[in-house]
Amino acid sequence: MTIFQGRATRKPSGGKLRPNHSKRRYELGREPTLTRLGDRELRKIRSYGGNSKFALLRCDYANVYNPKDKTTRKVKINTVKENSADPHYVQRNIMNRGTVISTELGDARITSRPGQDGVINAVLL
């Protein structure tokens, strides 16, 4: 089943909206990329205009920025500690933007979008 991100067919009052045009390709969405903990695995996605995005399917390293000494290091991710998007993501070790992860340096919050950027960037808490 495809994901449609166009205009709804009903008004807030419940009345029916007449479509101006049929569904277009640029109104399509896609299934969410649930980035999990594991060996690095990427998927290339063709986006609008022939450009490409890289969906990160699995990853076990993150680029962690330390605001105190202003350095960035590539460190191993131990586990997912907190995820405000869905509490069940913690049990399944699914990472997205805003997730708190446990690393070798300590706890960090993910600032990148792994499902679209293809990399995990985080800031130490």
Swiss-Prot record:
Gene Ontology cellular-component terms listed: ribonucleoprotein complex; ribosome
Keywords for this protein: Ribonucleoprotein, Ribosomal protein
A GO molecular-function descriptor: structural constituent of ribosome
Source superkingdom: Archaea
Assembly: Part of the 30S ribosomal subunit.
GO biological process entries: translation
Pfam families the record matches: Ribosomal_S8e
Organism: Picrophilus torridus (strain ATCC 700027 / DSM 9790 / JCM 10055 / NBRC 100828 / KAW 2/3)
Keyword Isomerase appears in the UniProt entry: no
NCBIfam families with a match to the protein in the record: eS8
InterPro entries: Ribosomal_eS8, Ribosomal_eS8_CS, Ribosomal_protein_eS8_arc, Ribosomal_Se8/biogenesis_NSA2
Stated family: Belongs to the eukaryotic ribosomal protein eS8 family.
Residue segments, region Disordered: 1-30
PROSITE patterns: RIBOSOMAL_S8E (PS01193)
Listed name of the protein: Small ribosomal subunit protein eS8
